[in-house]
Amino acid sequence: MSTEGSAVDTLTIEEAAAELERLAKEIAHHDALYHGKDQPEISDADYDALKRRNDALEARFPELIREDSPSRHVGAAPSVTFSPVVHARPMLSLDNTFSQEDVQDFVAGVYRFLGRLPDQSIAFTAEPKIDGLSMSIRYENGRLVTAATRGDGTTGENVTANIRTIAEIPNELPKGVPAVVEIRGEVYMAKSDFLALNRQMEAEGKQTYVNPRNTAAGSLRQLDAKVTASRKLKFFAYAWGEMAEMPADTQFGMVQTFKDWGFPVNPLMKRLNSVADILAHYDEIGLERPDLDYDIDGVVYKVDSLELQQRLGFRSRSPRWATAHKFPAEQAFTEVEKIEIQVGRTGALTPVARLKPITVGGVVVTNATLHNEDYIKGIGNSGERIRPEEHDIREGDTVIVQRAGDVIPQILDVVMEKRAADARSYEFPKTCPVCGSHAVREVNEKTGKTDSVRRCTGGFICRAQATEHLKHFVSRNAFDIEGLGSKQVDFFFENEDPSLQIRTAPEIFTLEKRQQDSLTKLENIDGFGKVSVGKLYAAINERRSIALHRFIYALGIRHVGETTAKLLARSYGTYEAFATAMKEAAPLSGEAWTDLNAIEGIGEVVARAMVEFYKEPRNVEVIGRLLDEVTPAEAEQPVTAGSPVAGKTVVFTGSLEKFTRDEAKARAESLGAKVAGSVSKKTDIVVAGPGAGSKLDKARELGVQTMDEDEWLALISG
């Protein structure tokens, strides 16, 4: 059962460990999208909520802090497209504050750490938090030599050639500057330039950009510096990395020095002493925000004295002497013109509000997700009422729209005073709008709870599900067919030419053969070419033999993710054994059903979803055709005979020096061990490298066997 919405103080240690594992993976996923690809899929507010949940769990269960915890890392791994640059000093993130009370606590914490009374003797700087791309620019002997993105905080991407195209960034500094100077700041795109660029894109019939921040980041990562130069990027300097000598002894003085050296600095930066003045400046900047020609998402406060900054020091990923006071999400009023239903890969019917275009935070909003049937009625996922009963969302309603975290729009409430007298409640469809199949809300037999999502039962016969299923089938953790991405799948799916059409997975593997006898050659179609088509065929043929767990995952069975697919592959060994077991488990009773539920990590909900999938004749028919083209390899079984760690639960902690964590995990699993992320009474062995902390302490407290890497290697090699 998910503990996602449960209060932290009600969780058991096992539940907390499981949720910390989920949060680590989820936050890492969103970090990669935001910092690495500039394509966030959740709002800043939702992301901050995930981080706060993680921090709260770690505060209550410090012994469960993971090596891959979000509290220990910044940003995401740098892209392989640009050469890596190791920062001379790490580029850390800032802790966030969200209320006046949080700011008061931050200031009080500074005084408390320094052993002082809060007598307003400590000055702070306050400046807008620019919503752009963090940058570190290195000068040696006054000349610009390197510019790098934040990356993961330790290693960034070398974008020197592109940075040189930004007119506001000097290529040379005045005489007399220190021998080594690293200027840090934010690259951004002005709102006016962003709107002009989108007008140009519209005039050329091209897709417009979403917001200035993503556009600036994408522009800076262009392989052709001429493209970057055409985007009119700008820069604000506000910090520094390595400095051969310090030209000032305060934060404010350093930034003023940057201005003297020719860098643009933010004119709204102030030096203040009291919490009241700090909060007043926050309000002033908030009032000016709509009129600024650049996006900001908060105000940054820093202790002004560099000596005090040094005494205050750092936490694992952020300084104690600074915090970012975030703005609440921006809101606006608009009209719901229509409610439409989208159908996803698993058949979920998701309502989307088509809105009368409205600008919120510099971005034109035309759509908002309505999540599910209950959300339209004002009911949350746990059955709680989130709006008054009469505030259901109807077509024609005037609504309050919020860009939470300035990314994803959502409807907060209905303005009842403007509701038309003849406005009718929205009737959620009971059939799929794409294929006409029944759409049902499943009931959990154990809990009796009705799923908040209504799903199409059409499976592969539903065009919407079929398209999304194909995209899942070729995705990175499934068949991973290079050259067959989302756009290509849409092209082949919608094509009416029999030699080009791909509507089920088996047709991917017959494409080349069908093309041989066709007059319509793929290589002659816009967007393709002889070389790219050849590479596509080669990539497809490479996947005619595939690992069993990838094959199972690619089938797109509901609830069967990558980890579950690996468990199934290891348990059954061959696809034939797996498919036979699913067929024999169909009555939801008997030996096959019992064995399926006995697999660790497979609960009744997952087991039932798999059995139901194989009950559908259409699914079995498609898989049969797929097996004519593809051979799932027999799963490699752990070598447990004579293995000293077979059946044991192992935890790796600290900095491993002789192998990577993935290598250590793979080796342990190949010997029949289970690798866990946290220490508990069920743990058998803890392998501790340098820097091992709370997990090692917990192991000793519980009497769990501990060893270093050499002892571990001796154990598994003996």
UniProtKB/Swiss-Prot annotation:
Single GO term (MF): DNA binding
Catalytic reaction list: NAD(+) + (deoxyribonucleotide)n-3'-hydroxyl + 5'-phospho-(deoxyribonucleotide)m = (deoxyribonucleotide)n+m + AMP + beta-nicotinamide D-nucleotide
First-tier enzyme category under EC: ligase
Record domain BRCT: where: 640-718
A Pfam match: DNA_ligase_ZBD
Alphabetic keyword roster: DNA damage, DNA repair, DNA replication, Ligase, Magnesium, Manganese, Metal-binding, NAD, Zinc
Binding site for NAD(+): D44, A45, D46, Y47, D48, S93, L94, E127, R150, E186, K302, K326
Gene Ontology cellular component annotations, sorted alphabetically: cytosol
UniProt GO BP: DNA repair; DNA replication
CDD domains: BRCT_DNA_ligase_like, LIGANc
EC number, as in UniProt: 6.5.1.2
Catalytic residues in the record: K129
Function: DNA ligase that catalyzes the formation of phosphodiester linkages between 5'-phosphoryl and 3'-hydroxyl groups in double-stranded DNA using NAD as a coenzyme and as the energy source for the reaction. It is essential for DNA replication and repair of damaged DNA.
Recorded family membership: Belongs to the NAD-dependent DNA ligase family. LigA subfamily.
Name of the protein in question: DNA ligase
UniProt organism field: Rhizobium etli (strain CIAT 652)
Annotated gene: ligA
